[in-house]
Curated annotation (Swiss-Prot):
Zn(2+) binds at H16, H18, H204, D285. The record marks H228 as: Important for catalytic activity. Binds 1 zinc ion per subunit. This is Adenine deaminase. The gene is AAH1.
Amino acid sequence: MVSVEFLQELPKCEHHLHLEGTLEPDLLFPLAKRNDIILPEGFPKSVEELNEKYKKFRDLQDFLDYYYIGTNVLISEQDFFDLAWAYFKKVHKQGLVHAEVFYDPQSHTSRGISIETVTKGFQRACDKAFSEFGITSKLIMCLLRHIEPEECLKTIEEATPFIKDGTISALGLDSAEKPFPPHLFVECYGKAASLNKDLKLTAHAGEEGPAQFVSDALDLLQVTRIDHGINSQYDEELLDRLSRDQTMLTICPLSNVKLQVVQSVSELPLQKFLDRDVPFSLNSDDPAYFGGYILDVYTQVSKDFPHWDHETWGRIAKNAIKGSWCDDKRKNGLLSRVDEVVTKYSH
């Protein structure tokens, strides 16, 4: 098994991180107080109680119920900045070099908070992460799939200035997967893509939904990346396609265990994806709720796949860099750093 020191030093990219999912209990309660938010009856009353609840979710919906309550404490641009900045401070110490992060404006606009407030707060934190830590980042605006597509089209309208000027680098699709297949959002994706030819497209698919949802996201939504995608393992033709096109899956091992998608990280088809040359990155998803940030994810995977050597981990890190949406100069610099770290620890 490789050392934690090696995993920490390995340059890491994160592509599946919900900023609202980094809301730790020790920030949630102070923000509730700052903004005079009364948490619902029956909600845990202390950091300790809430941490206990986060240790055991029944399924995706049980988690989402808590997740959406948590978002209610975020009101001002400063709140959104504080949230994202807390994330960047943590992951900087863990060897993160590039982050492409999700946010859910509809969780906030539905409460009367403007998309400008949310986006500007998060973007300020991204700017500071670059100036202070050298971390490059991109914002991915997600549509909530449990919201009517007509409402999602309105969200895209509201976000138009940020899509056109590149503040929003990509469009994503999240929330409860099974009842809301990709075909419902064809018009939304087409509309967003028409606003900026450089807008990247991704979608959550194949987590609780079938492999067919992955194929549909590729065919109908024209995405070039799949978030989760682990159920692709059951479709041999799809695996061939993902390998041929080098379509990256953004896999979230701790999340998959916490939400009972699998019982342990060792059950994930990571070795199969490596063997089939299907590129993937390892990510923390909603780390405040799922018990670990990026280095915790890498460390747990290394325990469950102890036969992976330095070269294998170097390959995983390189696939994450190659699948990122940063420019070639940045990619080449990071790829060289991976080689340096692998060489350092292999001798």
